[in-house]
């Protein structure tokens, strides 16, 4: 039964709402996915709307011509709680401008809600999401991509928690003052920095999730060792499809994540599973089959799906 549910979930999140693609999922699976989507709460761990809207304003409370997320498409696809990514580029890692940008992007999400309180609501707890689901609202929880705005100050961590941030992706495309990045060959800290280890403890104390997407393998294992709470990979995929690419997680890491009680939201698009970005459906079928293999190695609760809308080519 759990395996059948996992296979349905692949179609549920991958097939729903993806229009204009060369290939289509079988009609029976699509119908089943649509039925489940209307009754279940669907969470997406990482959607890059705030940075997109801040860079080039568009009203996502209405249908939009570009991008991958707006209210009508979210409703059509059954998406209930997309985490709004408060993304800060690595170029701002050593600048207080990172704090300013993070606050501005949070303001952007709050403005979206203020513009359409009959459509969206900020969510800071699971209870918020469940209540808003019953009210017919799309919940907008907040996650910070790149911990640069913390700037080595736990007071900033508290500030952003108070503003609604409920997870932090420790690093992004470069190593920062918290953690080494999977993309950065320099590996400055050989995992987490001394401050990064302190930060893990305080995030646990606050009840803020630790996101290990983008971090190096060493940093991942150090987080698993230090964290007293389950951690997440908000938008990563499986290294089986991309041998040698540290951005994705290998089977040993998935086992460790499962033992921690955490979850990986598997990014199923573009170069995360295939160099040929437009062959997404064939690779998705392969991902479904590999998912079944991974179920034999880790807990079913460890695996989920994630689209990284706006940043990923499908």
Language-model features and meaning:
Residues 198-212, 216-222, 253-259:
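Substrate-binding cleft of carbohydrate-active enzyme catalytic domains
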Residues 1-10:
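Bacterial N-terminal signal peptides that target proteins for export
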Residues 9-19:
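Bacterial N-terminal signal peptides
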Residues 188-204, 223-233:
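Alpha-helix-loop-beta-strand connector modules within alpha/beta enzyme cores
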Residues 153-157, 219-229:
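Distinct, well-ordered alpha-helical segments
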Residues 21-190, 239, 243-314:
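N-terminal hydrophobic targeting/anchoring segments and the immediately downstream early-domain regions
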Residues 173, 215-217, 228, 236, ...:
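An acidic- and aromatic-residue-enriched active-site/binding cleft used to recognize and process polar
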Residues 188-195, 211-216, 249:
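Short, contiguous, pocket-lining structural segments
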């Amino acid at each position: 039964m759990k395996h059948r549910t996992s296979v349905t979930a692949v179609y549920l999140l991958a097939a729903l709402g993806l229009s204009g693609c060369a290939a289509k999922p079988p009609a029976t699976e699509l119908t089943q996915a649509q039925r489940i989507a209307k009754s279940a709460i669907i969470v997406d761990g990482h959607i890059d709307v705030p940075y997109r809207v801040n860079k080039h304003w568009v009203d996502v409370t209405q249908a939009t011509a570009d991008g991958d997320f707006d209210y009508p498409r979210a409703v059509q696809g059954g998406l209930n709680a997309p985490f709004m990514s408060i993304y800060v580029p690595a170029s701002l890692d050593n600048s207080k401008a990172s704090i300013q940008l993070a606050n501005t992007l949070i303001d952007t999400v709050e403005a979206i809600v203020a513009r359409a309180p009959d459509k969206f609501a900020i969510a800071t707890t699971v209870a918020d999401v469940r209540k808003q689901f019953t009210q017919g609202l799309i919940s907008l929880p907040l996650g910070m991509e790149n911990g640069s705005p913390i700037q080595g100050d736990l007071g900033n961590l508290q500030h952003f928690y108070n503003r609604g941030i409920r997870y932090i992706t420790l690093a992004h495309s470069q190593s920062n003052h918290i953690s080494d990045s999977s993309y950065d060959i320099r590996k400055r800290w050989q995992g987490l920095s001394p401050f990064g280890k302190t930060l893990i403890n305080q995030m646990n104390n606050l009840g803020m999730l630790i996101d290990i997407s983008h971090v190096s393998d060493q940093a991942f294992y150090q987080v698993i060792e230090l964290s007293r709470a389950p951690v997440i990979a908000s938008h990563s995929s499986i290294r089986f499809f991309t041998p040698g690419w540290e951005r994705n997680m290998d089977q040993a890491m998935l086992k460790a994540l499962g033992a921690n009680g955490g979850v990986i939201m598997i990014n199923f698009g573009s170069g995360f599973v295939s160099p040929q970005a437009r062959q997404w459906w064939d690779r998705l079928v392969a991902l479904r089959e590999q998912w079944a293999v991974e179920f034999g190695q880790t807990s079913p609760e460890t695996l989920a799906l994630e689209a990284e809308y706006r940043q990923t080519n499908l």
